[in-house]
Amino acid sequence: MNPTPRVAIRPFVATDSAQVQTLVSDARVAQVAGNIPYPYPAGGAKTWIASHGAQHRAGTAIIRAIVSLEDGQCIRAISIDQMSRGLNSSGNLGYWVGVPYWNKGFCKEAGQLMLELAAKEYAMGRLVAAHRMDNPASGRVLQKLGFNELEPQMMTNLSGQYLFRCYEKIL
C-alpha cells in the first residue's frame, strides 16, 4: 500500500517491541482498546509481535504497525481479525493509538490504508468494527472511513462488560 503523506502501514518487526511496550503500558490505551491488559506484562509486546506470523499464515488476522513518516516511530496498531474467506468474506477492524498521537488524524489515514489492503489484497467484502460508548473519538474515525452505524450491543472485553457502538462497511 502506498503511504499517506504522514503514515505508512507495515508488518510489525521485533525492533518495534520497545516502542509498543511503552505505548500500551499507558492505562488510557488499555481503557479505550479493551483488549490490552493493564498493567501490561513485561515482555508482552515482544510476545504479541511474535504471534503475528502464525495468525497471518492461518488466515485469521492481518496486523500492521502504523508508522509516522515524520519521525519513523511506530505509533499504533491496526488489524483485521476474525477473518472469514469465500463468498461472504469479512473481518473485524480494530486499532489502538499511543496517547502522544491521539487527536491528530492518524487513525483515519491508517484506516484508509487498511481498507484498501483488505479490499485489494484480501478481497474482503465487509468489515465490522465497534467501540465503547465512552470512546466517541473511535466512532468519529469509523464514520469518516464510511462505516455505517448499527444497533449498539453489550460486549465483554478485558475491562468488563460495556455497551458498544457497532458499525459495518461494505467494501
Model region roles, listed by residue range:
Residues 30-51, 62-64:
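Conserved GNAT-fold acetyl-CoA-binding loop/helix
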Residues 50-54, 116:
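Surface-exposed alpha-helical segments enriched in charged/polar residues
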Residues 55-59:
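Short loop/turn motifs at secondary-structure junctions and domain boundaries
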